[in-house]
Amino acid sequence: MNASSNVSNVEIANKIASTAALFRKYFPDASVNFSPWDNTNESMQDTIDFAFHFPGWSPLIECRAILLQLRIENDNNNRVPKLLGIIMRGMIVPSERWRVATIGNWEMTGTHLPQKEQKDNLFLVCKELYKLSLIHI
């Protein structure tokens, strides 16, 4: 579900803004899109989705945009959902170039992987997302 559609209280709005700021800390040239899907995508209520667009194709990160999906568990007892995992996809329309998921081995796969420094920064983004209070792990 689009990050912009997931804001139901101040705490979630703060965590969504913090997620965007955290990503841009490591990739300052990226612009954030809080609504990467054309529709509300109601069937994907177990994710909070962002897209980060670069000013052109980046040979260092091997993509033009990154789709960031936070897999969440909504618990009515908590105002902020629990983070279950993170999926990032490096994209060049119309195809995926690489993917990393924090579920399992945290292994990056794909046909065109980012350079080592950018790859390390992507993993740092994931680690720091787990540190946000959005996460109850």
Please tell me what each predicted stretch does.
Residues 1-51:
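Charge-rich, low-complexity N-terminal segments
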Residues 30-85:
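Amphipathic, interaction-prone secondary-structure segments
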Residues 67, 84-90, 120-128:
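Low-complexity, flexible helical/coil segments
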Residues 89-112:
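Short acidic, glycine/tyrosine-flanked loop/strand segments centered on an H-E-D-like triad
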Residues 106-128:
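Well-ordered alpha/beta subsegment
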Residues 135-137:
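Conserved small/polar residues in nucleotide/adenosyl-binding loops
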